[in-house]
Amino acid sequence: MDLRIGQGYDVHALVPGRPLIIGGVTIPYERGLLGHSDADVLLHAITDALFGAAALGDIGRHFPDTATEFKGANSRVLLRECAARIARAGFTIQNVDSTVIAQAPKLAPHIDGMRANIAEDLNLPIDRVNVKAKTNEKLGYLGRGEGIEAQAAALLVRV
């Protein structure tokens, strides 16, 4: 059995005037994440983990931030396209585990919606998708509320 594990990471700065979208969920907050696309830090980390597990590079290789067609892109669309490319490469996604690190806002009320979106986009049962939320205990740039980080791991199997 050919199992593949991938790890993904992303971070974006929090700025005024942008919506805060994490895991495809718009979260009420006075600031949002800065980025070329919708800056969904969680979906970007998951996308990187999936591409990495299949040895297909990273999100920037497939959806470069220099390409105008990805300006303001919905990261759920990118995640679905990633899943299609993974399938074309001969893999099925087994599960995804992820962590979002944010001092604020509280993410717990939004976790179920994030999991549902990710499961839908990856065509997985929801019990194969996990999202955790942590603070940075007020340490560093994350603890000062300057940004939000996400980490993800994905398991693929070659079919």
UniProtKB/Swiss-Prot annotation:
Q: Which Enzyme Commission number(s) are listed?
A: 4.6.1.12
Q: Which cofactor does it need?
A: a divalent metal cation
Which residues make up the binding site for a divalent metal cation? 10, 12, 44
Pathway the protein takes part in: Isoprenoid biosynthesis; isopentenyl diphosphate biosynthesis via DXP pathway; isopentenyl diphosphate from 1-deoxy-D-xylulose 5-phosphate: step 4/6
Catalyses which reaction(s):
4-CDP-2-C-methyl-D-erythritol 2-phosphate = 2-C-methyl-D-erythritol 2,4-cyclic diphosphate + CMP
Name the residues that span the membrane.
Answer: none
What InterPro entries has UniProt attached to this entry?
A: MECDP_synthase (IPR003526), MECDP_synthase_CS (IPR020555), MECDP_synthase_sf (IPR036571)
| KW Metal-binding (keyword) present | yes
User: Which keywords describe this protein according to UniProt?
Assistant: Isoprene biosynthesis, Lyase, Metal-binding
Q: Where does 4-CDP-2-C-methyl-D-erythritol 2-phosphate bind?
A: 10-12, 36-37, 58-60, 144
Q: What does the record's cofactor remark say about binding? A: Binds 1 divalent metal cation per subunit.
Q: Which Pfam families match?
A: YgbB (PF02542)
Q: Does the keyword Metal-binding apply?
A: yes
One of its GO biological process terms is: terpenoid biosynthetic process
Site note Transition state stabilizer, residues = 36, 135
Family according to the record: Belongs to the IspF family.
Give the quaternary structure: Homotrimer.
Function noted in UniProt:
Involved in the biosynthesis of isopentenyl diphosphate (IPP) and dimethylallyl diphosphate (DMAPP), two major building blocks of isoprenoid compounds. Catalyzes the conversion of 4-diphosphocytidyl-2-C-methyl-D-erythritol 2-phosphate (CDP-ME2P) to 2-C-methyl-D-erythritol 2,4-cyclodiphosphate (ME-CPP) with a corresponding release of cytidine 5-monophosphate (CMP).
Please report the name of this protein according to its UniProt entry: 2-C-methyl-D-erythritol 2,4-cyclodiphosphate synthase
User: What is the organism field in this record?
Assistant: Paraburkholderia phymatum (strain DSM 17167 / CIP 108236 / LMG 21445 / STM815) (Burkholderia phymatum)
**What high-level taxonomic lineage is stated for the organism?**
Bacteria, Pseudomonadati, Pseudomonadota, Betaproteobacteria, Burkholderiales
